[in-house]
Amino acid sequence: VLTITINRPDKLNALNKTVIEELHTVLDSFYKHPEMKAAILTGAGPKSFVAGADISEFLELDATGGAALAAKGQEQVFSKIENSPKPIIAAVNGFALGGGCELAMACHFRLASEQAKFGQPEVNLGLIPGYGGTQRLTQLVGKGKAMELMMTGAMINASEALQLGLVNYVTPAEELLPKTNSLLQTIIHKAPLAISEIIRLTNLAAIGAENGLQEEINAFGRLFDTADAKEGASAFLEKRPAVFKGK
């Protein structure tokens, strides 16, 4: 399991162009190395996961530059995480605001420490979320609550995030990474091809794709042709643990 740490603690791990480019490089490497089965995304230091974008970069932007910034981030990082065929889980260790909340939401699911805080405060800058926040927050917490959080720019704590379904677990700070790692250890011992299909099909469901059920039927059928499916059935009938190879 790879651990990816956003490491700008002096800037509360804010996302700037350099961080986006570095994340893109790391994700590319993660995709290409079959021995890396899953990844944890977290922030350095005790205070912050990612406290938004680097606002100092905003002053020079116009409409074209703003749209280009959002498009590049979406393509190189946020959509790349969401559509990763291998699980990427966020371990939110502190502030996850603006682009930080969006980064956590792009992950397949999220765990948070008791100190974590979430919010989309872009409205306070006369802006809106630009890295998928309007879409993913709505998918995760529902239209009404997403509207309220984005319109007020309010921050919520970890227990509220848990209640809303924004995070799956809340742990004491020192248990956050061990708990995330333990969940991933369970997942990486399952069949990798099935996990990839679960990610792809669940993402289709989240965007309300009309062909989701047909895609599921097709994928269900395809998996019967895999060595892993044969191994899974044999192991079950022989009452032994399955050993999946991703084939």
Question: Language-model segments: which ranges?
Answer:
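Terminal peptide-recognition signature
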Residues: 4, 8, 22-23, 41, ...
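Charged catalytic carboxylate motif
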Residues: 18, 22, 73, 80, ...
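Conserved CoA-thioester-binding segment of acyl-CoA-metabolizing enzymes
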Residues: 1-42, 61, 79
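Short C-terminal tail/terminal secondary-structure segment
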Residues: 241-247
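Crotonase-fold acyl-CoA enzyme core
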Residues: 79-193, 209, 222, 226, ...
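Glycine- (often His-adjacent) and acidic-residue-rich active-site loop
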Residues: 35, 43-80, 96, 208
